[in-house]
């Protein structure tokens, strides 16, 4: 990802470049020592501890882009920035699968869709997108990203809802999607106080998704963070619900590579089923 670098990591911290600004953020997975001297870490424009400490007048938001899609980055609560750079390979996968699909118009469902970067990649590739998140501020941010790209007229449906309830209703309506993307958290709340617990609800959600996948499906992609399961568990669960379509299952870790020492930082896991039609 050209607008991002993992400059260094160590001792529970990450030093990262988001566009023109350097951020120092916590990461409990980083158990090793830093490579760069402390003086290099002091160049950070903002540091997150319990809250963001804005040292060098980082603006309220600033622009980044990847492969023609622009998005706003912000110093958001809980150390977040509105973008997960390790997912850039997934965005390119989404773009390739849709743009090379034989389907006349691909109908995509994006669940736990956050600030909408994957939705914009899907839309730009020619898909009709249903973008769902339980957080209204996240939907607002996604709309800002849409407008930044001049895509106000793109066929994207924006929905604030609980993922399990929505897919329940879609199954009863007979709705069908050619591809499904999801980034389920370990815990979360729906807009009406619904409780999301990955260990209890993930299989139910995948079952719902298996009922609304079309008869010419392209892919189902799951990214997950901070869960106790492995990517193999995700893959096995996908196989159970989508293996009847044939195709193939892939899985692995979401990683970032340091500039300082070349170490790989694992940030999450992923698994995906694909029909295999698009190579």
What are these regions (language model features)?
Residues 163-244:
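S-adenosylmethionine
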Residues 217-279:
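C-terminal catalytic and target-recognition region of SAM-dependent MTase-like enzymes
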